[in-house]
Amino acid sequence: VATSIDSYTGKPFSGTLNYNVQRLADGTPLTEKFPEADFPFQGISYKAKYRSVSMLDNSILRDLAPENAVEINDLDAKELGLETGDMVRVTSATGSETFGKILARPGVARKTIAVAFGYGHWEYNTNAYQVDGKDVAATSPREVGMNLVKVSLLDPTFGDKMYGLAEMQSGMCARNGGAYRIEKV
């Protein structure tokens, strides 16, 4: 990165470890477009011990951890009147939403939603379909839980084109960060 040029700004990267605020493709800070007062949470996904793409079909591992949770700091949960097990709606700043159960714990950073990936699939045989005229039944355990990717932000600076929020240093889809709110349902 030290010798690379930022493809969005045309300026060189710093070359040293530093903090960069999340920005949209036009350089606007994310919090300028989506104020923290409206969307106070950022999201982070992590790999669960017993759940990944290679383990989705292992029924024993699925039984150990059948669903994930919307994990938030216990102090944030208290401020929102939430308790572990409460069902919530997670809404992104660009309008997509998903649902999950709260897990309140002190090990999550304040104003952060932590979600184990490998859950909440909307494909991977979660829908019935046909192959060569033969019906293939859905395998529902793969759709249990929530998936943070479903509510990833779109970058509104691209107008009517659908373009996901990008991580500025690499240009890849931003899997972490974003702007979200949580509401009890």
Identify the residue ranges that each predicted region occupies.
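Long, contiguous, secondary-structure-rich segments that constitute the structural scaffold
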Residues: I5, S54-E71, L75-V185
